[in-house]
Structures are given as C-alpha cells and as structure tokens.
Amino acid sequence: MAQAQTQAQAQTRSTESPGTTPPAAKPTPAARLTRPTLTAMVIGSMVGAGVFSLPRHFAEQTGVAGALIAWGIAGAGMLMLALVFRTLALRRPDLDAGVYAYAKAGFGEYLGFFSAFGYWASVCVGNVAYGVLIMSTVGAVWPALGEGDTVVAAALSTVGLWGFFLLIRRGVGEAASINRIVTVAKTVPILVFIVLALCYLDTDVFAANFHGTASTGSLFDQVRGTLPATVFVFLGVEGASVYSRHAQRREDVGRATLLGFLSVLCVFASVTIVSYGIMPMGEIAQLRRPSMAGVLEHAVGTWGGVFVGVGLIISVLGAYLAWTLMAAEVLFVAAQDDDMPRFLRRATADDVPVRALLMTTLLSQAVLVITLFSKDAFTFALGLTSALALIPYLLATAFAVKIAGQRRTRRHSTGDLVVGSLASVYTVFLLVAAGPKFLLLSFIVYAPATVLFMMARREQGRRLFSEGERVVLAVSVAGAGLGVLALTLGWISL
C-alpha cells in the first residue's frame, strides 16, 4: 500500500515548485491514530531521559532566578515552534512526515533531504543518550555499568536496541498503543516527585539558591548555559506532525501538538524549580545521573532514589519507542518521495517501514560504540542530538514564514507570519547558544549523508546536483572539513 504512493508523488514533483498549490491527497495508511494517541506520542517523545537530569544540569549553570528566566524563554520559543507545526498541519495537510516534508516543499529537494537526514540522525543519537542514562541509573547498584559508558553498558544497550527493533517490526498500530500505555505509566513517577518535593521544600535552601553562585557567571551566561538542555528535552514536540499520515483526523495533529507541549512544559519547569528547595545547588550539581533520583533520595530516603530510577527506566523505554517510530517514518516517506534510495521504501503488511527501521537501529548502534571514546557519553549525545535537530526545525519555521504571505492563506497571514518569525529567531538563537563544537560535529554527520541523496538521483537517471544545490554541498563539505580539522588539532573533542 505504501509503495503505491510513489508514482503519483513523482509526477507531482515535475510540476510543483516549492510552496505552491498542494498536490492531491495520498492514500490513507492502514493504522488510524486518534487524538489521545497522537497526544501521547508527543508527550511520550518529550518526556524521556532529559527530564530526570534537569536538576543537575540547571544547578551546574544557574540558580532559581536564571532557571525561571530560562524556562520563560524556552517555553515561549518552543510554544512558537509548536504553533508552527500546528499551523503547517492546518495549512498544508497534504504534507506527510512533518519536519522533512515542510523543508522540501519550501526549499527544494536537497535541503529537504538534509532535513530528513538531520532529523533522523538526531533521533538516533538521542536514543543512544537514553540507553546511556538507563545504564547509568542501574550502575548505581551495578558498578560494572559505570556512568553508562562502559563496555558492559554498551553491550546491554545493544540488546535493548535490537529488542525494540523486533517489537516495532510487529506493527505501527501495536507499537503506538503500547506507547500510549507507557506514557501514562511514566508520567506518574514524575508527578509524584513534584508533589513530594513540594512537601519537603525548605524555603531557606530555596532562598539561598535563588541568585546562583559567583562561579556561575552573569545572569545572561547562566541562562544561555541552560538552553541546550531545554532543546533536548523538548525534542519530540513535532511528534504528531511527523506521524500525520496515520492520523484519523488531520485537525487532531495540531491539537495534539499544542496540548502535549503545554502539558510537558509545566512538568519540566516544576521538576527544575522544586529541586532548588531540597538541596544546595552545589550539591545538586554533583549528583550522579539521574539527578532527580538524588534529590528525592535526599528528601525522603533511599526508596525515593529507587522510585525515580524505576520511573526513569519506564520513561526512557517509552520515549525510545516513540522516537524510533518517528525516525523510521521520516526515512520511509523521504524514500517514497525519491529523496532517499529506493531500498528504504519497503514496508511490511502491517505498515512498518522495516528497512528504514533497520537503518535507524544500525546508526544508533554505531553512535553507541562512539560514546565509548567520549569524555562524557551522556553530555556528548545530548549536545549532538540538539544540534542535529535545530537545522530541520529552522527550515520548518522558515517554511511557515514563506507560506504566510501566500494568497491562499492571506486571511491567516499576519498571525502566521508573527509566529513563524518568532520561532525562526528562537531557533537561530539556539544554534548560536549550542556553540561551535556541536555545529562542527553536525557538519561531519551531514556531509557524508549526501551519498544517499546521490544514490537516489542516480536511480532516477537525474543530474546529481543543480547549481543551487552545489552551493549547499560546498558549504556542508567545507563545514565537515573544518570539523575534522578541529578534531585532529584538538580544538574540539568528543
């Protein structure tokens, strides 16, 4: 069924220019996802490993005042991004696979390819971060796992990677149903943490942590230092739009995105702020990951750490499931649109893009091996995940700005333009805040991926690159070369 879409899309490509009239509707896939299920996918994608390490990360960078400002900026910026995905789902319901489809429709096939690959790669690296954190959690009682970066930890994470591959291969609908159940199960421990932390909150400790310490620098530096972590924890806000071709009703995509985002924002901010009332921020900054476990253990005793640890494992497994579903979907649709090689088009009778799923698992496996050579496996995976995802996000927000002025959306153009512009500015700010290290590492990942794009073009008997695409290629290759040079000379490190 999935393969039947290819001919119609290939014919559309020859006549449709970026941002013009939408093509005809595509056949509806077998799985039909309701609004609660789509909302669960958004929440499940965002509530993963990151939230359990927020207390330590924020305490390393800032006090209560800086945290409040950071969440205000992150919340407003990510709200604009969530509204962009909601708007695009309404204005262009013909576009499937969310982030990738928007970049291609707005800026052509090559940048669309980069968006698809970058988003997919960010999910794969993010899944490795999840594995590292699970192993670090269990490492508290099994020292052989260390901080999740030992050979034993990597071996166990490998078993988990391939176990999920087999689960998802059984069917999209079944995996999505499991994700909805897991989303409910993993939210409970986080809410319990917030309630207990409020009960044990010490106002004197909270006041002492309010302005941070001299070592954290100026308030601006404090806030900037926290933002990369907020990018990581909010990755997945586009979850419903990525899986929109499976939605029972297309209008549910935008509603699920907004509802999921607002719910998660409240949870993330609460987890961070209440922790400042339990321990001095210097002690929080020294906690073992997941730092939420250390905070609750300090408040209520040993059982609190165990409780959070169990909650983390459930949470991470659920987020891994949701992210893997989205990653495989993006590769599959890109292959359907002839922007990835044809071998990625294969889907099972249960509508599972099995070869895209296999590629996802293989890349995660490769990154897992690389983390064995990094100084801090979790921080490395977190930073690279965020940097890889920001380019696809920026292209999506730019597309929203582009279509805002088109005649067919004139009635909504002012509001759409404001939202799209604010989301674009916020995304650029995050790219700057990420720093040069992870941007250069991202180029090293992006540039070699062009081989897949060239394979797809050769299969179609087309010229490999247009004039404009050659410019993009030159920039990506130059960035990758600079990144390799920086690694070689020790300017940056893993």
Predicted regions mapped to residue ranges:
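Membrane-interface "cap" regions at the ends of multi-pass membrane proteins
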Residues: 1-61, 65-68, 78-86, 94-96, ...
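Helix-loop-helix junctions that connect adjacent transmembrane segments
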Residues: 20-30, 68, 145-152, 181-309
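Loop-to-transmembrane helix boundary motifs in multi-pass membrane proteins
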Residues: 30, 34-35, 154-158, 248-250, ...
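Hydrophobic transmembrane alpha-helices that form the core helical bundles
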Residues: 59, 70, 79-161, 165-169, ...
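Transmembrane helix-loop boundary segments of multi-pass membrane transporters
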Residues: 59-63, 67, 136, 140-153, ...
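TM-loop-TM module centered on a large, flexible mid-protein loop between adjacent transmembrane helices
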Residues: 100-103, 108, 140-144, 226-227, ...
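Membrane-interface loop-to-helix entry segments
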Residues: 152-203, 257-261, 386-391, 415-422, ...
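C-terminal membrane-solvent junction of multi-pass transporters and transport-like membrane proteins
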Residues: 347-348, 393-479
